């Protein structure tokens, strides 16, 4: 009987390869006592079943809903601050007094008027709705008033024109408010009832389509009758609040009443008593207080007078005459400050924060003791190693020159200490860059005219010829910078090794090292720096959110005693300027280096140079400073930009008081007529003095004679010594070739160069030199009040023919 044999289609299993896998014992021996990770069971990991997951999600939704409702009840309720509403008309045809009169509904509740200067504010108490509102108003052309009031307003009520929505001034106001950060807002249309019935529906449709660009998916409310005003009030009370991050972590206050007590020594300085409702966070008397537009001050004590606008007043008989319910409360609030005062908290000198903003530099701090023998021996060894590296240095090279010569990616800097000369160099380079082309195009600019209205005397009176000439020169410099970035003509009257003695070459701008603590200016001895800014910011914010602070709670009506305040603050308040105060977080009064990411505003076309004085609105502060512009990259070195370009985001670097982000940033430029023009918008990135801004200078030469991989280059230098000085620096061309200087030829600056390929006759030889630059200390907390904004009738554009 024959045995069964497997066929060709029988499954063949893989043979077991024994000995290739470790056993448990060998694995334990190799582990040397380390235990393997334990796989957690579902119960230990606390995984929930589907039913429990749904129940948990519903509980979270319920908690969020209750938190929103609690916030709505507190804002404007009996235990919270009044609901502050800022009314902003966005068109010149809108009647602001008529709108404010409609909102003063006597049938709804009690109205308390407060008239100061040009502003008309009133408090509306509505016990039936269990809500109280505080209405303020601002014209869109009054830039500081609008931006300051928007910082503390809970809701902004925009009044729109039924036909156009907003005009040019209103559009400019919206651009500034969107850049600063909008709180909760509502749109209302005034005057639509005056149109025929057939046109009202079409007008509302066209208006909704027009405002969709700024306010997508927002509902338009009407404000023409008392009934529509009541519906608007209900909408304001029931809206979900949008938060601004920079104010939610700080205590702030809008002044309802102000009193001034001059000091005995000087009548121009004294104690300022500010009364208002605490908002944001708990107000501590030991913290510093920043009055917007005036600076930082210390508080003496906090009083707790009675609330002058209670939602449910007790013991007050109703007046028979309804007109008696209208009260002028400007003086009553001050009287209440004097009667029934209760001292809530007094400042503790041991715990109170100091007003010191700058470090007092010690002139003896830079001295060192005599080095030890070990340090001397290490220095000798280092010199021996470095002597091997600089073997290619030509004869006559000084020790200073050898310190910054690059080889194989290593470098050291020889930047000087004459920092005042740094500030002048920027202007000198601009003049040198435009010297040649200005001589060629001088006749062309002299024969240019602005338009066909030369004989119009009225038009000529509006044109400032000197300002036009300066603006034309700026446009020319900006165009030259775009066409030839960082290129500079080598001076003939000064040796290049002297003119560019503070510059160095880098083998690679991205990877070559640069010590951020090297050759710092004297101003860096005056500023503060964090060891780890991110961790400090997180710890301060965590303390604000979790730690209970002693002081005035949110919603309390308090009186702050602020010391050493100038009398001009009270005078401006009595003229109608709103007074707003913010409590500072720790370290926010100290000076440091702020880096802000900004992008140029599309509506501005004027050139803006670096180190030009601008007006900053950073969070709750505003100040004047001269920023540096640099590229926004992730590297450790950032190239300086000589102009604020429109095609990319840049980083503005200034000396300013510390502010913890997030904070919005607005850059303005003051014109000759006093108006502030919006230049750029952005946000605060970091507080980091070690961020290096590197200025690049490009020297250019022309190939005179071209061989296979050799070329004779001229016009880059004009003497033999300069060629020898810059010989170690690498060359490049606009067409991508790289090379080095071999030797000088003659005494007129010609030099023999070798490249990695053959040059083209139309190519240009370039040499990159670098220097670290620092901002100018031009910080000024005083910002002049701007003239109401109006759209300029004279176009600031330059004819294209003049720039070609």
Swiss-Prot record:
Residues 46-55 have a biased composition (Basic and acidic residues). InterPro entries: AARP2CN, Bms1/Tsr1, BMS1_TSR1_C, G_Bms1/Tsr1_dom. Residues 1-67 are annotated as: Disordered. Residues 13-24 have a biased composition (Basic residues). It is found in: Nucleus, Nucleolus. It comes from the Eukaryota. GO terms for molecular function: GTP binding; GTPase activity; RNA binding; U3 snoRNA binding. The keyword Nucleus applies. Disulfide bonds: none annotated. Signal peptide: none annotated. PANTHER family: PRE-RRNA-PROCESSING PROTEIN TSR1 HOMOLOG (PTHR12858:SF1), RIBOSOME BIOGENESIS PROTEIN (PTHR12858). Belongs to the TRAFAC class translation factor GTPase superfamily. Bms1-like GTPase family. TSR1 subfamily. Required during maturation of the 40S ribosomal subunit in the nucleolus. This is Pre-rRNA-processing protein TSR1 homolog.
